[in-house]
Amino acid sequence: AQMQQSRDWSIESEPGLTVGEKITPISSVGLFTPSGKASYPSVAYQLAVPAVVAGVPKVSLVVPPVPGGSGEIDPAVLVVCRKLGIENVFRVNGPAGIAALGFGTESIDKVVKIVGPGSPAVTIAQVEMQRFGTSTMMLLGPTESLVIADQTADPVRLAADLLIEAEHGTDSSVVLLTTSTGLADATDTELDRQLAALPEVRAAACRASLGPNGGCVLVDDLDTAIAVANDYAAEHLQVAVADADVDRVVDGLVNAGEILIGQDTPFSAANFILGCPASLPTSGFAHVASGITADAFLKRTALARADGTAIRRMASNVIALADHEGFPAHANALHLRAATHVQER
């Protein structure tokens, strides 16, 4: 559906003048799939599918070996690559992999763009590659989620959903934004119960994400909740409010990587199968950026064609601007065409 919207287009904006865009895929891309805290085949396919759909002719994927193993790559990541026809798969650790994609090596071809989430070191490596002409996306830092909930929300499901992004690591951030003290208390109790059932390494990550890195914010009303959420600009945002208020809240939310509506739309489903991008803006970048979709692998080239009548009609405006900015060659190109027209007559 997105590719159907990303097609060449042109219109006659005024008599004799046609403008439009030519949309083409970038020539190559390097995808980074993290493997430091766990293996993420879901990230592999949610990065690779848009690149393949966009028609990028050369897609390379870099993935570190699975943690605690003997240097092997998670077979699930290889299955993703095989199903999508990606043959350039390389086992390289984070920053080294980013550098290899950006500069090229004897075995890894240089690419024009690199995308993918990772550790702070991977993020810094991507920023550094921009200095050498390799395009990257917005910074993809530690994961974060925010839930807007009122007194109608189910604290059991709410606690379960808060723990989804919290278990990623001790640098994650999870926030409950609610108008109800009763819901906050009930959710806190339920969090304790559900945390006890998690493996200790995941429970420790959740406690850090909910405690030092996150928490609960009580607000007077949903309008304040909307304002706070827009200021925070969360990577993942869920709306768990009364049906009568859903549309108003969603309409008011403008800064978020994704907005999941209702308590039957958990973050884990969006992470894996709903079709939402896996790599979303973090650290406030949702104020200005979007998730990685097919558009991230396309470029738009402006097209314009004017006939003689149209360019002569616009000549005086072009000449006036050229004279004001001190560019005589700009103006001369229009004077020449006007003079040629007079001679032809």
Tell me the role of every PLM-derived stretch.
Residues W9-S13, L31, L61-V63, N88-G94, ...:
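General beta-strand structural signal in soluble alpha/beta enzymes
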Residues P57-V66, V174-T181, G262:
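Short internal beta-strands
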Residues D231-R345:
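C-terminal core of ALDH-fold dehydrogenases
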Residues M138-P212, C216:
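A conserved active-site cap/scaffold subdomain adjacent to cofactor or substrate pockets
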Residues I11-V79:
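Conserved small-residue-rich beta-alpha loop and adjacent elements
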Residues G85-S173:
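Conserved NAD(P)+-binding/catalytic subdomain of aldehyde/semialdehyde dehydrogenases
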Residues A1-Q5:
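Long amphipathic alpha-helix in the N-terminal Rossmann-like dinucleotide-binding domain
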